[in-house]
């Protein structure tokens, strides 16, 4: 792949990643970049650009501000006083449905052998020096 094609591919991927519509990035009829296309992609030298990036693309900055970077959840209409910026940590635990039967977990999981997939396949034997010390084995 020659350098021109690799640069075009890189610019295409960057432009699509930042939300530019496909019609603005790549025109199907004309595959060679012109001065107008270079200006729309921001490829001109920094002295040649007429507007800074934030002024040229207000839609992209508006999209970013709509996503929100706040750590607290959106305010609820319950009317409870809440300090701004502080929120209760949400539990990732999934609640059990009503009437669900709880399954008892094994407590001696470290005593099992585990395969490379994280599945247990057998109970570990006692250490070689502990032959006479294990009372439960017959």
Swiss-Prot record:
Very high expression in placenta, with the next highest level in testis and moderate levels in pancreas, liver, small intestine and brain at much lower levels. Expression levels increased in both early placentas and molar pregnancies and are reduced in choriocarcinoma cells. Expressed at higher levels in first trimester trophoblasts than at term of gestation, but only expressed in the villous trophoblast. Residues 28-39 have a biased composition (Polar residues). Residues 77-89 have a biased composition (Low complexity). Residues 1-19 form the signal peptide. Induction: Down-regulated during the progression of melanoma in vivo. Diminishes MMP9 expression by effecting reduced NF-kappa-B binding to the promoter. The keyword Signal applies. Disulfide bonds: none annotated. Changing residue 115 to K: In HH13; significantly reduced efficacy as well as potency. Residues 112-121 are annotated as: Essential for receptor binding and receptor activation. Processed by MMP2 and MMP9. GO terms for cellular component: extracellular region. The record marks 118-119 as: Cleavage. One of its GO terms (molecular function) is kisspeptin receptor binding. It is linked to Hypogonadotropic hypogonadism 13 with or without anosmia: A disorder characterized by absent or incomplete sexual maturation by the age of 18 years, in conjunction with low levels of circulating gonadotropins and testosterone and no other abnormalities of the hypothalamic-pituitary axis. In some cases, it is associated with non-reproductive phenotypes, such as anosmia, cleft palate, and sensorineural hearing loss. Anosmia or hyposmia is related to the absence or hypoplasia of the olfactory bulbs and tracts. This is Metastasis-suppressor KiSS-1.
């Amino acid at each position: 792949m020659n350098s021109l094609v690799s640069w075009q591919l890189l610019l295409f991927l960057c432009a699509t990643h930042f939300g530019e519509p496909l019609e603005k990035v790549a025109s199907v009829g004309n595959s060679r970049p012109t001065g107008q296309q270079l200006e729309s992609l921001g490829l001109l030298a920094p002295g040649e650009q007429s507007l800074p990036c934030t002024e040229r693309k207000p839609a992209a900055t508006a999209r970013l501000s709509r996503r929100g970077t706040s750590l607290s959840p959106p305010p609820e209409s319950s009317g409870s006083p809440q300090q701004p910026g502080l929120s209760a940590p949400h539990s990732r635990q999934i609640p059990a449905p009503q009437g669900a039967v709880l399954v008892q977990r094994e407590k001696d999981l470290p005593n099992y052998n585990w395969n490379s997939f994280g599945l247990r396949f057998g109970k570990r034997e006692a250490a070689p020096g502990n032959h006479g010390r294990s009372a439960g084995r017959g």
